[in-house]
Amino acid sequence: MAMFHSLPSIHVKHQKNTAELESVIMPVPAEVTISMSQHIGAPCKPVVKVGDTVKVGQLIGDSEAAVSAPIHSSVSGKVKAIEQIFNARGAKSEAIVITTDGEQTIDETLAPPAIGAELEDVLVAARACGLMGLGGAGFPTSVKLVGLKSAAIDTLVINGAECEPYLTCDYRIMLEKTDLLLEGAELILRHMPGGRAVIGIENNKPKAIEKIKADAAAKGSKLEVLELKSRYPQGAEKVIVYEATGRVIPEGKLPSDVGVLVMNVGTVIKLAEYVKTGLPLTSRMVTVDGGAVAEPKNVWVPIGTKLEDIINFCGGYKGEPAEIILGGPMMGTSCRDDQTPISKTNNGLLVFNEKEAKMAAETACIRCGRCLRACPLSLSPAALDRAYHAEDVEALKALHVNLCMECGCCAYVCPAKRHLVVYNQLGKQMIKK
């Protein structure tokens, strides 16, 4: 089937309100709640018990499963409880509650990993770091990097597009940690003989483009900078692979099947940082914004910090909050309440007021075709809508519902305000039954 088209997908209001604000580090909260399920794959099991004293970077959760990533304490303090919570994905998971001591004492056993000429050293380091995709998906990095054992992978695509409205944490980290970005790219390129590394950045981020180009030239880095048009969903995996290489990822396949390794910019930077310092993934930068936040910021947050504590650090609520979203407004998830703890994959915390959160009433499809023209994969969302409501599983398959990447373009442009993404999600579940 045809995929992609020459016309832009959709243009959304950028709302990059925090783009020029340097990141800040929030104080350690009184308590953190660290979920044992923060990644795609098997959840971790606690390796500490109630009453144990823990330090920053200490291993507190692990799994023997092939697809998983260990979890480390983001604070120093004492384990208060091990309990079931609703995590940032809205699912129930086991979690470790730690009362902090305010000292942030680092685990003395931590040390930079030994990185030699073998790829295995990098795989071991990525796993020991507890690293996963920091752009939202959360796939364990050590598992993804196994693909480098195949000579078929010849291109590293670093995703710096950050096309979601409001979010600017990737932009800030590109500006603030450019050296580590280049070091991370070179580390991966060593295990991709004759390979190419390219970072895709939307052209509404000229400072990042210019800085990375200048620093790469000064250091003799092989990293190429690809200026992307500012359109949504430019940062979607299938889209950025096509833009960077001209290759199309077939339905049901991965970037590795077309010779590409895709990594978020924050993931590459953290890998390089871990190789230098030996400090695992215990904190991340989060964009905090929205009309119901008093002081929007880009904040370095200890993993497991409650949303309430982050919002209070940003001046508290401005008026009455109507909705909390983790991630961006297009693909993020609505949150139960502000007691939810932040996870490794949460790049945004948006707090909307009633005006921003208000949804228009859904009406009948008028068959205008806007959703079809907006879809970057040339699917037919209106036809999928009808197939779902008719419970026509064969039609859902024929219309390639599983190819939908749930970017939200169709629902964004729909004049009838149809919940098209939701129907595609439910359609996928219908096929599995």
Task: State the predicted function of each range.
Residues M1-V47, V97:
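N-terminal, Lys/Arg-enriched amphipathic/low-complexity engagement segments
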